């Protein structure tokens, strides 16, 4: 029996869970989300936020979508918008990689760059200004607070992990951008499947440790960092802090060096935030109590999306680049 998808947004999910054989002790299992249709974990929320808006009747012909993004959510929304015939405007910090900008343009999105120093807060503010200029014309999807974000991970990512491990998952690690992945997967495994001893680990940049600060009851003090896709500088509404059992901070250098190791030692093209997540798993394994635990790690995107960044710096000499 043939299986034909009616549009590309319907092809999300069922990404492979791959054992890391040379990084760690063989207990780290990487969920390779670059196998999604627009090559990142954000394909899931891009599709579901648009499907949800259609179901609720707020997205209809003539309405244009608006969303702030660090890149991957924007690309995910752009491919779904193109597949389903919607116009899309994205606001994004100017510090994001040129590859992301080019992909967004190629998918037909209108791209508005915002001041890099203002981070995602600046992009969010600009998106809100655009919508306020004509509320009847524009619809803001709000990935940081839209319940359709964690919902898709609760419905797809969580069940996939549970099935692929036969329920033998002890630790779940995800970098936190919107918080949707960590929240949705944890809700499914801890709640629906009743595995309350699952250890859910949030990964954030050491230079912007806002989750650790929030859990410690400290003042939130975000900072600049180079781990694109995580560390938005605030606690997103979609991050359920009650589900977070542990927070691990990762430096820019740790994220980049581990992403390179994934490429060189495991043959997995991994982005910077993927490196951060695996670096967190390696830190966990330094604790003997985690030696025999199965650790599932989300690898959000492919390294090809970071060719112009520090991830690929120093790989070629000037002469080699000119050849």
From Swiss-Prot:
Functional description taken from the UniProt entry: (Microbial infection) In addition to its role in cysteine synthesis, stimulates the tRNase activity of CdiA-CT from E.coli strain 536 / UPEC; stimulation does not require O-acetylserine sulfhydrylase activity. CdiA is the toxic component of a toxin-immunity protein module, which functions as a cellular contact-dependent growth inhibition (CDI) system. CDI modules allow bacteria to communicate with and inhibit the growth of closely related neighboring bacteria in a contact-dependent fashion (experiments done in strains BW25113 and X90, both K12 derivatives).
Membership in a protein family: Belongs to the cysteine synthase/cystathionine beta-synthase family.
GO terms assigned for molecular function: cysteine synthase activity; identical protein binding; L-cysteine desulfhydrase activity; protein homodimerization activity; pyridoxal phosphate binding; S-carboxymethylcysteine synthase activity; transferase activity
Temperature and activity: Optimum temperature is 50 degrees Celsius.
Classification lineage: Bacteria, Pseudomonadati, Pseudomonadota, Gammaproteobacteria, Enterobacterales
Binding-site residues, hydrogen sulfide: 8, 35, 269
Transmembrane segments: none
Pathway membership, UniProt: Amino-acid biosynthesis; L-cysteine biosynthesis; L-cysteine from L-serine: step 2/2
InterPro entries: Cys_synth, Cys_Synth/Cystath_Beta-Synth, CysK, P-phosphate_BS, TrpB-like_PALP, TrpB-like_PALP_sf
Cofactors that this protein relies on: pyridoxal 5'-phosphate
Induction field: Repressed by sulfate or cysteine.
Keywords of the record: Allosteric enzyme, Amino-acid biosynthesis, Cysteine biosynthesis, Lyase, Pyridoxal phosphate, Transferase
Residue numbers binding pyridoxal 5'-phosphate: 72, 177-181, 273
Natural source organism: Escherichia coli (strain K12)
Protein name (Swiss-Prot/TrEMBL): Cysteine synthase A
Activity-pH dependence: Optimum pH is 9-10.5.
Chemical reaction(s) catalysed: O-acetyl-L-serine + hydrogen sulfide = L-cysteine + acetate; thioglycolate + 3-chloro-L-alanine = S-carboxymethyl-L-cysteine + chloride + H(+)
GO biological process, any: cysteine biosynthetic process from serine
Signal peptide bounds: none
Summary of the knockout phenotype: Significant decrease in tRNA nuclease activity of contact-dependent growth inhibitor CdiA-CT from strain 536 / UPEC (deletion in strain BW25113).
Residue numbers carrying N6-(pyridoxal phosphate)lysine: 42
Cellular component, GO annotation: cysteine synthase complex; cytoplasm; cytosol
EC number per UniProt: 2.5.1.47, 4.5.1.5
Subunit structure: Homodimer. Forms a cysteine synthase complex with 1 copy of CysE.
The keyword tRNA-binding appears for this protein: no
């Amino acid at each position: 029996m043939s299986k034909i998808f009616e549009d590309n947004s319907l092809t999300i999910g069922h990404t492979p869970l791959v054992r890391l054989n040379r990084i760690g002790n063989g207990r780290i299992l990487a969920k390779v989300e670059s196998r999604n249709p627009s090559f990142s974990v954000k394909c899931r929320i891009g599709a579901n936020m648009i499907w949800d808006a259609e179901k609720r009747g707020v997205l209809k012909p003539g309405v244009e979508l608006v969303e702030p993004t660090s890149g991957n959510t924007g690309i995910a929304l752009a491919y779904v918008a193109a597949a389903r015939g919607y116009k899309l405007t994205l606001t994004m910090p100017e510090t994001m990689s040129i590859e992301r900008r080019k992909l967004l343009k190629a998918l037909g999105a209108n791209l508005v760059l915002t001041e890099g120093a203002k981070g995602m807060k600046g992009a969010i503010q600009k998106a809100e200004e655009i919508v306020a200029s004509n509320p009847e014309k524009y619809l803001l999807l709000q990935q940081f607070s839209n319940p359709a974000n964690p919902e898709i991970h609760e419905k797809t990512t969580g069940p996939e992990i549970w099935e692929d491990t036969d329920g033998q998952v002890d630790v779940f690690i995800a970098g936190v951008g919107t918080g949707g992945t960590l929240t949705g997967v944890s809700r499914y495994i801890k709640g629906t499947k009743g595995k309350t001893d699952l250890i859910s680990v949030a990964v954030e940049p050491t230079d912007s440790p806002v989750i650790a600060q929030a859990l410690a009851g400290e003042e939130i003090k975000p900072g600049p960092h180079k781990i694109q896709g995580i560390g938005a500088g605030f606690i997103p509404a979609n991050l359920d802090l009650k589900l977070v059992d542990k927070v691990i901070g990762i430096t820019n250098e740790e994220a980049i060096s581990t992403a390179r190791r994934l490429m060189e030692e495991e043959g997995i093209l991994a982005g910077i935030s993927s490196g951060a997540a695996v670096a967190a798993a390696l830190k966990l394994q330094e604790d003997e109590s985690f030696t025999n635990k199965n650790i599932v790690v989300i690898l959000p995107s492919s390294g090809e999306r970071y060719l112009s960044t520090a991830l690929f710096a120093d790989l070629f000499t000037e002469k080699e680049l000119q050849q």
